[in-house]
Curated annotation (Swiss-Prot):
PROSITE patterns: CLPX_ZB. It comes from Polynucleobacter asymbioticus (strain DSM 18221 / CIP 109841 / QLW-P1DMWA-1) (Polynucleobacter necessarius subsp. asymbioticus). Gene3D superfamilies: 1.10.8.60, ClpX chaperone, C4-type zinc finger domain, P-loop containing nucleotide triphosphate hydrolases. The lineage of its organism: Bacteria, Pseudomonadati, Pseudomonadota, Betaproteobacteria, Burkholderiales. This is ATP-dependent Clp protease ATP-binding subunit ClpX. Keywords: ATP-binding, Chaperone, Metal-binding, Nucleotide-binding, Zinc. Zn(2+) binds at residues 16, 19, 38, 41.
């Protein structure tokens, strides 16, 4: 007779066609045409499908785009101050990704009977850049130029935007770029890094963000075109033109140098958002010369001393100032959105130390918590740290080195010390270079030993 298990001898035991478990080992067994699947296999398949869907590039209508107010609100959590720059960036990024929603969807590749992709009959048409068209109006992208002193938050703004929008993001250093054919990095290496950031998913890379830092360091050396070849200055600006505007960049599939017999990945840069940032040290003097009132003759106005600060001058920047600084007009025209960042004052630096989600004081508090101790930084100490950073002219970047220097001895000794409850940084620890206070636990046999470390 047939195999049976159970109370009824005529009952046939059913098994999952995928994992082989019997109907008695699982909660539910669902029947199909001559096959069965259990609830455990269904859960596993659901997880696999969700992971695969998460890896796919988001298509139109998949997710609502955050409004400029929401984008700025997210930036406020990580970046202190710079209200004008945040508002400018929020509008530019919102318009850019709203424009991407109107791009034609990529056509799926046709496969032959062996599963291999069939080449398009019209190769020229297949390589045309995708353009966003709404009611017959073609929408062009607006790349962004960030101008501000060092340590004012240019890079952090770009990083926060990319993290919020969940798009591929890459940072490039303009000082390492040279013209094609010379020792150094070609501008197309930037796109190669973007591809690496998204595991060579071309569709995803074509919607990414590229941040080119130190763009002011590739300015040409004078107002007039040089008679000698400037391969790391004006030459790089010329090479960046088509990449920033939009072109089909040929990128080696797995990096390395190009050679004639190599297959290339074609990446359309038309819909990649380029953000260029630089300190532009000395630009304020160019603006000051342009805005100063001068005259000739007995009734001429004698220009007085301009008391405006760097931040006030940078707000008045015009394309002609950037050209005089050394950027070529063609590149300036391809960076239509200009956002200036203000120089950080003492109050802003104190806020940077304590308020953002990943504030510097919170980071060191977390480090000391791992050793079983607390960290207290008094208000006077915060003010002293901010004043020291302003004196060094390093902006927010100088805050970490000052705080690190103050805590160096404590972090060296703390793992070897026992029963340290709290570390206190006061004004003397910063201004005079004194060591922080160590507060020991009170429930020990020894008395309160609050003293200098």
């Amino acid at each position: 007779m047939s195999d049976t298990t159970g109370t009824n001898s005529s009952e046939k035991v059913l098994y999952c066609s995928f994992c082989g478990k019997s109907q008695h080992e699982v909660k539910k067994l669902i029947a199909g045409p001559s096959v069965f699947i259990c609830d455990e296999c269904i859960d596993l398949c659901t997880d696999i499908i969700q992971e695969e869907i998460a890896k796919l590039p988001k298509e139109e209508g998949d997710e609502s785009l955050p409004t400029p107010h929401e984008i700025r609100g997210n930036l406020d959590q990580y970046v202190i101050g710079q209200e004008h720059a945040k508002k400018t960036l929020a509008v530019a990024v919102y318009n850019h990704y709203k424009r991407l929603q109107y791009l034609p969807k990529p056509k799926k590749e046709k496969l032959d009977k062996d599963g291999k992709p069939v080449e398009a009959s019209d190769k020229k048409e297949s390589k045309l850049p995708a353009k966003a068209i709404v009611d017959g109006v073609e929408l062009a992208k607006s790349n962004i130029l960030l101008i501000g002193p060092t340590g004012s938050g240019k890079t952090l703004l770009a990083q926060t935007l990319a993290r919020m929008l969940d798009v591929p993001f890459v940072m490039a250093d303009a000082t390492t770029l040279t013209e094609a054919g010379y020792v150094g990095e070609d501008v197309e290496n930037i796109i190669q890094k973007l591809l690496q950031a998204c595991d060579y998913n071309v569709e995803k890379a074509q919607r990414g963000i590229v941040y080119i830092d130190e763009i002011d360091k590739i300015s040409r050396k004078s107002d007039n075109p040089s008679i000698t070849r400037d391969v790391s200055g004006e030459g790089v600006q010329q090479a960046l033109l088509k990449l920033v505007e939009g072109t089909m960049a040929s990128v080696p599939p797995q990096g390395g140098r190009k050679h004639p017999n190599q297959d290339f990945l074609q990446v359309d840069t038309t819909n990649i958002l380029f953000i260029c940032g630089g300190a532009f040290d000395g630009l304020e003097k160019v603006i000051q010369q342009r805005t100063a009132k001068t005259g000739i003759g007995f009734n001429a106005t004698v220009p007085g001393k301009d008391e405006r600060g760097v931040s006030d001058l940078l707000i008045e920047v015009e394309p002609e100032d950037l050209i005089k600084f050394g950027l070529i007009p063609e590149l300036i025209g391809r960076l239509p959105v200009v956002a200036t960042l203000a120089q950080l004052d003492e109050e802003a630096l104190i806020q940077i130390l304590t308020e953002p989600k990943n504030a510097l004081v919170k980071q060191y508090q977390a480090l000391l918590t791992m050793e079983g101790s607390e960290l207290e930084v008094r208000r006077e100490a915060l003010s002293a740290i901010a004043k020291k950073a302003i004196a060094r002219k390093t902006g927010a970047r100088g805050l970490r080195s000052i705080l690190e220097g103050s805590l160096m001895d404590v972090m060296y000794d703390l793992p070897s010390l026992k029963n340290v409850q709290k570390v206190v940084i006061d004004e003397s620890s910063i201004a005079e270079g004194g060591k922080p206070l160590l507060v020991y636990k009170q429930d020990l046999d020894q008395p309160d030993m609050s003293k200098k470390a």
